[in-house]
């Protein structure tokens, strides 16, 4: 009788805010008409905790300028502990680089919206992000860079 192949397991075991901040450099922004320019930056990082667990941290940073004056800088490090058991090695990068950030983003989006509103600014709803596409582009760029260095 052939040995049974272990079933791959993928699960989010814990989600938490690792760090968050809101900086409002000057109160003068509250006296001007609100027409902000937003600069949004996203990044993710994965760290292996043990054989089957990874911590993935999605960092979302939003800088708002109003009338050429810095209005606020909001940043959240949304983290999750993911179980990846018996996952084929060639799929782990895609899971950590695209799937996990897709899971974390709605939570990070909510935290950003909440801290911006608590800072007395209008609600900020970030548009959905296609992390699968971003991961594919970063893989293509890494391949181009590797070929250029060869």
Curated annotation (Swiss-Prot):
Superkingdom of this protein's organism: Bacteria
Compartment list: Cytoplasm
GO biological process, one term: protein folding
Entries under Pfam families matching the protein: SecB
Gene3D superfamilies: SecB-like
GO cellular component, one term: cytoplasm
Keyword line: Chaperone, Cytoplasm, Protein transport, Translocation, Transport
Molecular function in Gene Ontology: unfolded protein binding
Function: One of the proteins required for the normal export of preproteins out of the cell cytoplasm. It is a molecular chaperone that binds to a subset of precursor proteins, maintaining them in a translocation-competent state. It also specifically binds to its receptor SecA.
UniProt-listed HAMAP family: SecB
Protein name (database record): Protein-export protein SecB
Native organism: Psychrobacter cryohalolentis (strain ATCC BAA-1226 / DSM 17306 / VKM B-2378 / K5)
């Amino acid at each position: 009788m052939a040995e049974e192949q272990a079933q791959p397991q993928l699960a989010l075991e814990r989600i938490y805010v690792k760090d968050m901040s809101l900086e409002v450099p000057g109160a003068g922004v509250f006296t001007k008409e609100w027409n902000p320019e937003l600069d949004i930056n996203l990044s993710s990082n994965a760290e292996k905790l043990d054989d089957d667990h990874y911590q993935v941290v999605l960092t979302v940073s939003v800088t708002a300028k109003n009338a050429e004056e810095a209005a606020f800088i909001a940043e959240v490090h949304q983290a999750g502990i993911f179980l990846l058991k018996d996952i084929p090695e060639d799929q782990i990068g895609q899971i950590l680089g695209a799937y996990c950030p897709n899971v974390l983003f709605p939570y990070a989006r909510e935290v950003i919206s909440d801290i911006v509103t608590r800072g007395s600014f209008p609600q900020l709803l970030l548009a959905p992000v296609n992390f699968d596409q971003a991961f594919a582009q970063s893989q293509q760029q890494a391949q181009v860079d590797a070929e250029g260095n060869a």
